[in-house]
Amino acid sequence: MTLRIVSGRSGTGKSVFIHQEIVEQLKSDPLGHPIFIIVPDQMSYSTEYELTNRHGLQGLIRAQVMTFKRLAWLVLQETGGIARKEVNGYGYRMLIRKLLEEQKSEFSLFRQAAGKRGFTEEIETLLKEFSRYSVNSSVLAEVKESLKAIDAPNTLQAKTNDLYVVLQALEERLGTTYVDSEGYYPILTEQLKYAETMKQATIYIDGFTAFTVRELELVRELLKVTKHVTVVLPFDHIDEAFDEQALFHEAALTNQRLHDIANEEGIDVEPPLHFYYTQRFQSEDLQHVEANFANMVPHTKKTSGDVMVFEASNRRAEVHAIAREITKLTREYGYRYQDIVLLYRQAELYDPLITSIFQQYEIPIFTNTKKTMLHHPLIELSRSALEIMTSNWKYEPVFRSVKTDLFFPLQAELTIWRERADRLENYCLAQGIYGERWFEEPRWFYKKYRGLEFHSRVQTDEERAMQAEIEAIRDEIRQPLKSLQDKLSIASTGKDIATALFELVESLQVYEKLQAMKDRELERGDALAASEHEQAWNEWINVLDQFVYMFGEQEMSVEEAAKILDEGFDTLEFSRIPPTLDEVMVATVDLARLSNIKVAFVLGMNDGVYPTRMEYEGLLSDTEREWFSQIGYELAPTSSNRLLQENFLFYRAASTPSNKLYLTYPTADEEGKALLSSLYIKKFIGNDKIAGLLSGVQAERVVMDPIELLDESALPYLRHPRTALAHLMVQLRQAEHSRELAPEWLALQKFYQQDPYWALIFDRVHYPITHKNEAEPLETYITQELYGQKLTSSVSRIEKYFRCPFSHFTTYGLRLEERAEYRLETFAMGDLFHEALKWITEETHRLQLSWIRLTKQQIKQLARQAVEQIVPVFSHQILLSSARYRYIQRKLIRIVERTMMALTQHANVSHFKPIAIEASFGPGQHEQLPPLEIDLTSGKKMFMRGRIDRIDSATIDDRSYLRIVDYKSSARDLDLNEVYYGLSLQVLTYLDVAMENSTYWLPGETEPAGVLYVHVHNPMLKLDKDMTDSEIEEDRLKQYKMKGLLSENAESILSMDEQLEESSGHSKIIPVYMKKDGTPSESQSRIVPVNDMKRLQHFVRRKHQEAGNGILSGDTAISPYKLKSKTACDYCQFAAVCQFDPSDGKQNYRQLMQAKPNEIVDKIRKEIE
């Protein structure tokens, strides 16, 4: 029973010495008494590798590499103390989640936080810390009393009490039946003296700088029981134990504690074995850095070039620079990948970059960062299936489960079934399928949505076929989930719930499907991905086992079980087999324990990262930990103590390699925000005021794109053809615009063009640079296939063509459309308003009610009845689907009511009366009016169809006048510039149709009176507190003033607003200002001469003709217009299709010139005449 301390700075050969000593013992007596080498988890594989591969051993029999937990298993197997069932990480997390729910009423501080996501993990972390430092519920009870006696803060007392409640409940639940991962330590400490194997054992402990209280108790017991204990510690002087600022303070303090234990237990302490001279370093620079790192005023040495610093423009440029340097080291200097390590923090930022960028350079890597299993299909299926049950079949969890592919038949062609599932998803999104709607058969009646015409149109054969497909894939999903729902509805215990979930997975043949996935990955040569499916299955089974262990006989709801299982699934991670190939090691600075490394890259050397900024102190703050320390209870170090350890962690990283050290840092993050370099960078290279460890080291600036550099400086960026190709493309694009290609880049281009493998890739990547983003005209036979022999069009289609021919092609040729969703769209509200006003007009006609004489009460009743009549057949009953939409329904009724009141007031002062409502025109049999026929070239015709909201007429001096009134759910006016360029043709087309078919309603000759817009809305008014009710109504009426364009005819204008006969000035209802002489003001009114109104009609026909000819000629030009600040791309849904880029000098908007209204009328007059 002896203790020996082996000490020394990094690289002095401590581990090498004990390995050689162990090897000598094994060679001299292979079957002698056991030797145990105890190391941290992350060192176990590398230590075994060192002992066998580097010392010529064929295997280990007498010696075993152990972690403390593996030692516990070994001892307890011998002594019989292993009878307890182990609660592993996910079982422990699930148990804590359950206890937090159960004890919520007992909490004084944690009550609100207990159910929040993440809090379980916080509690788990602290309870494990308590376990490591021997703080059980009895100790915590003493802590409570002590804190109360010294009048500690109330918050700390309340927190301690809540922690006591949780810890006591945890201990009661574990009892003598279960043990958690930390619970082995006290059992091992208790059982160690009964293990015969240990009594003659020799123990080596390596890789630790400090021990927790539990570990120290175990080391104490090892000293008492075993024959010999050697502990390897990295420190220089024993006096460093008394200096918190010392580099090796923690390890020296551990040395002091071990000596104290030996003295207390009467253990012999051998003379310390201290190593003074470094053996690791093949570089004078690195040897100098190690020796002088701790010095406040370091001795400066001229660099020999083995320490380099990269200053990168961002993290991506930083990782690219490292990949290039590794490529250089392996190609030109003979290093192997396994000689190189990347050390970093901020794994969440660097892992995706390292993985993707190193793939581009074909550099194999091994990372010890574990990947979560949360996104594996089996885990996602389990979580989403339970969420479906607890969320009433909401859309999101249903289709998360569907996208796992596990509902599809075992031998299914995945591409086909995924497309079917996508169509089902689109249907459910459009129809608002959730909850009981999954089981309401009428909901699954498929027709392509046609607004309010949905119920009146007959289902086509194509729609029937689509319905059959949707129902088939629906049943594949619905039936297993319904079976799960039925089983869970009668489940009462945790075991019942786990069994129901298992049976769902079993019924879907998930195990067989995972095996098929594994086989496909192996066929692709991805052994790592293949292993993940087997790991996921095994871990999923373990989670269910742990759940049943803990809660099998307990009564619980599905909601509660889902939350507990979710905590378990949240802890699952994929493990990776240690590297056996030649791979670059990627490891975190804090956990890495590495040997035989020649080159190290330390990434992300920024301020706040090295040393780390201690922003979060945990569930117990530093101040609260100090209260614990004050009353004699040790816990894990405070953040300030951890900060003191930062120097040692970086020292260990910097002294890891034997040959070369690279320190790299970005100067900006992904958003361009500036980042400062770490103070350790200054320590190495110094600055203007302070000398660094090494002189002559300059931070090498690396950028993402070498175009920022001189041509010679760009050459190092061309280390791999795959990444160099991207840089060449940037150069070629620049050469297109501004400069010739430099000889270096021309040579690179020649390489790609001549290499058999890269030539095809080069041509494919180079194509977008030389190719103009132009759409070629369609051939005649294609236009006929797309648009048919007989072209039928709407005004909105023609307007889309004039906005951008390619946009027209995507909508009407390719028939692209956005995915429909179950929500109230703006255009749908417009349909509702139109239908409501139509219904009111027809209802007043049926009841023989005059709009002029309608009372407010009648208007309110008619508005309510109109909307209520429409709602059941409107947009799949969306206004009945939720309380929010029912509120919107009431708002819509109010809008119709307000608009009706305004329209009745308009009617009171107007001679114009409606003669047609919702007048449809087109080639169909059910249309009220014939189509507007447009003659095209080659003898073809285009037939225009549409629906006119309202046609009004008035008879003045035996002459009839017609006007168009169009209802809009947003404010609108007629811009003659937009008319001229074909962007706004609707109301003038409607006027043309009405004039052409005027004899349907009116005898004799008819004149155009104008076109007007009514804004259907409920206006917000700015009220004065002194305003009367009549003034408020008058102000509201102003908000309904119609906009548009009228014929310059005083008689027809006065007939629209009789009040203008009594007084001059602005009309309250039409866009006219009447002068005192009884004529309208041209400058303050929206009017044109009658003949010009007729010319506008003819001009609009010409625009239709121009568009029709363009469409049939196959025009698909990517030519979006720009008029003032408006462009065709503003609300275009298909920008990703055309890839129009106005920043590219080759692509430009079709610029339309703005002109005054009278200038536009003059231009039209000239063109028509």
Curated annotation (Swiss-Prot):
* Keywords per UniProt: 4Fe-4S, ATP-binding, DNA damage, DNA repair, DNA-binding, Exonuclease, Helicase, Hydrolase, Iron, Iron-sulfur, Metal-binding, Nuclease, Nucleotide-binding
Q: Which residues form the UvrD-like helicase C-terminal domain?
A: 276-582
Q: Tell me the GO BP annotations in alphabetical order.
A: double-strand break repair via homologous recombination
- Which positions in this protein are listed as binding [4Fe-4S] cluster? 804, 1129, 1132, 1138
Cofactor detail note:
Binds 1 [4Fe-4S] cluster.
Q: Subunit info?
A: Heterodimer of AddA and AddB.
The record's annotation in NCBIfam families points to:
addB_Gpos
By sequence similarity, the record places it as follows: Belongs to the helicase family. AddB/RexB type 1 subfamily.
What protein name is recorded for this chain?
ATP-dependent helicase/deoxyribonuclease subunit B
Species name: Lysinibacillus sphaericus (strain C3-41)
